[in-house]
């Protein structure tokens, strides 16, 4: 593990996150915001670890704009900005919620304080359920619900989700003990809704899973490009727009998804259309504390 690269990726992610917050003003288009954020990551010498997620209001995650997307920010919107940065596969993952044109409110504070609380109990030997407990307590005591089917995640080189989750609720069976050197993203989500997300169209983010035989020439071409450029990290539909006519691109992606070569991430919406906030940091676990790489 290259700690220096993890820390450098975290510094860049923090800088870009702070700049993104200042750009999120009424009237700004999501497409313009996404292109500025991802462009800035590259300018600073890193690469996006995944397409920037710009999820509004009841949309919790996995929305990234497409070319031609005319969505603009309105005053009072809850905008979740989720940014991934990597240097040579070493990832920093961080998120912030902005209330466009307005001050922080209780719903935002709930997710932010939940994140701080989870970080404060994290160190080697602590069971993951204790982080879930810390998150759930902070959110519920403010009268909101944690989103039960979204969670933080272990991170490995070129692997955004490395198999172990940090839930946003206390679950007695979550007995995995944090180990020195573990890298985790902790990301509480708070909502005014029921505390659950469902998948809704469209799918705007994909990830390479494995090779699979496909007959469509364009699909084979696309798969080779995806493997070469993005490896096992998620990528945006937007990043491929212009590679081929739109109809062919959609068909090629559908073909690759159906074959099992790609995994699609549909947009996630709160089941009762509740408003959603999110805050996130990446940590490296140490014996008696953690390094927060994105702080």
Swiss-Prot record:
Family stated for the protein in its record: Belongs to the peptidase M24A family. Methionine aminopeptidase archaeal type 2 subfamily.
Designated gene of the protein: map
Annotated a divalent metal cation 2 binding sites: 93, 153, 187, 280
Gene3D superfamilies in UniProt: Creatinase/methionine aminopeptidase superfamily, Winged helix-like DNA-binding domain superfamily/Winged helix DNA-binding domain
Residue numbers binding substrate: 62, 161
UniProt enzyme class: hydrolase
One of the record's GO cellular component terms: cytoplasm
NCBIfam families on file: met_pdase_II
Keyword Protease carried by entry: yes
GO terms classed as biological process: proteolysis
Function: Removes the N-terminal methionine from nascent proteins. The N-terminal methionine is often cleaved when the second residue in the primary sequence is small and uncharged (Met-Ala-, Cys, Gly, Pro, Ser, Thr, or Val).
Cofactor names: Co(2+); Zn(2+); Mn(2+); Fe(2+)
Originating species: Pyrococcus abyssi (strain GE5 / Orsay)
UniProt-annotated binding residues for a divalent metal cation 1: 82, 93, 280
Domain of life of the native organism: Archaea
Identification of the protein by name: Methionine aminopeptidase
């Amino acid at each position: 593990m290259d700690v220096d690269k993890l820390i450098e990726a975290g510094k860049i992610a923090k800088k870009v996150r702070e700049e993104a917050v200042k750009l999120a003003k009424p009237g700004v288009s999501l497409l313009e915001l996404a292109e500025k954020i991802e462009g800035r990551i590259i300018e600073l010498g890193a690469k996006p670890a995944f397409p920037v997620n710009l999820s509004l209001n009841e949309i919790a995650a996995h929305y990234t704009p497409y070319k031609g997307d005319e969505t603009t920010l309105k005053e009072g919107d809850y905008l979740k900005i989720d940014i991934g940065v990597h240097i040579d596969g070493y990832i920093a993952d961080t998120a912030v919620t902005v209330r466009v044109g307005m001050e922080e409110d209780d719903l935002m504070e709930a997710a932010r304080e939940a994140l701080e609380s989870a970080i404060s109990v994290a160190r080697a030997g602590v069971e993951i359920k204790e982080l879930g407990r810390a998150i759930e307590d902070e959110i519920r005591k403010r009268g909101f619900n944690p989103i039960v089917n979204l969670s933080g995640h272990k991170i490995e080189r070129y692997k955004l989700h490395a198999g172990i989750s940090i839930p946003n609720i206390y679950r007695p069976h979550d007995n995995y003990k944090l180990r020195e050197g573990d890298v985790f993203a902790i990301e509480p989500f708070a909502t005014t809704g029921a505390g659950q997300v469902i998948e809704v169209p469209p799918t705007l983010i994909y990830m390479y899973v494995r090779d699979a035989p496909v007959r469509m020439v364009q699909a084979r071409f696309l798969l080779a490009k995806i493997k070469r450029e993005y490896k096992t990290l998620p990528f945006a539909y937007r990043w491929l727009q212009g590679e081929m006519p739109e109809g062919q691109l959609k068909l090629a992606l559908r073909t690759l998804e159906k074959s099992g070569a790609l995994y699609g991430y549909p947009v996630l919406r709160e089941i009762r259309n509740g408003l959603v906030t999110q805050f996130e940091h990446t940590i490296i676990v140490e014996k008696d504390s953690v390094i927060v790489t994105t702080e």
